[in-house]
Amino acid sequence: MSSLSLVEQAKKSAAYQAVDENFPVSAKVVGIGSGSTVVYVAERIGQLANKDSFVCIPTGFQSKQLIIDNGLKLGAIEQFPEIDIAFDGADEVDPALNLIKGGGACLFQEKLVAASAKTFVVVADYRKKSDNLGIQWKQGVPIEIVPNSYAKVIQDLKKLGAITVNLRQGGSAKAGPIITDNNNFLLDADFGAIKDPKALHDQIKALVGVVETGLFTSMAAKSYFGEQDGQVNIWSI
């Protein structure tokens, strides 16, 4: 078996175990995020016998498609602001279950769903584990901002200690900056190793023009990792 298929099997095992151990029997509203491991979360939830008894809230386009593809009932957070449990991936996780999220440009909706959930469970592969945020994930903290504030916010982030700040671009498919689902811009600010994610989040969030940061602190209850050797590793508070 190749190392890739071992990791892929571990991701599937981690996702299935996360659902089996945490999904409430009486759940009525379920948040489903995005990421390569969450694909298996949606698959497992789609196998539940009572899947017609709850609705699923997406965090973005990919998760909306996962919900539909697995025959699950699609809902909107505007209709269901109280979520029983949410599952999502992460770009980086530290031992205190602080997260960096937003590499896929959906951080606001991801944080809204996580904050609305009674229980928030992370599923990811071993590459997302880190002793400190900002070590494994080199691209920086994703920050959603109001478009006309970008020049000012970039200046302010550098005053807070950011080594580099980049306005995220759309790549070959789009000339110019990425536009989020909320019609905002995204910055990626590299602060190096982040010793106090909560304090940094608070400082960034206080800046005029900032809508939300990709620092998720004191939100996740558990994180399930698919390991390189095919095993599942669980971190919890």
From Swiss-Prot:
Keyword DNA-binding (UniProt): no
Similarity-based family: Belongs to the ribose 5-phosphate isomerase family.
Record-level GO BP terms: D-ribose metabolic process; pentose-phosphate shunt, non-oxidative branch; pyridoxine biosynthetic process
EC number: 5.3.1.6
Protein name (record): Ribose-5-phosphate isomerase
Keyword Cytoplasm: yes
Subcellular location as annotated: Cytoplasm
Pfam family, one: Rib_5-P_isom_A
Reactions listed under catalytic activity: aldehydo-D-ribose 5-phosphate = D-ribulose 5-phosphate
Pathway, per record: Carbohydrate degradation; pentose phosphate pathway; D-ribose 5-phosphate from D-ribulose 5-phosphate (non-oxidative stage): step 1/1
Gene Ontology cellular-component terms listed: cytoplasm
Species of origin: Scheffersomyces stipitis (strain ATCC 58785 / CBS 6054 / NBRC 10063 / NRRL Y-11545)
Keywords: Cytoplasm, Isomerase
A molecular function (GO) term: ribose-5-phosphate isomerase activity
Highest rank taxon of the organism: Eukaryota
UniProt cross-references to NCBIfam families, sorted A to Z: PRK00702.1, rpiA
Gene3D superfamilies documented for this protein: 3.30.70.260, 3.40.50.1360
Enzyme class, spelled out: isomerase
InterPro entries reported in the protein's UniProt record: NagB/RpiA_transferase-like, Ribose5P_isomerase_type_A
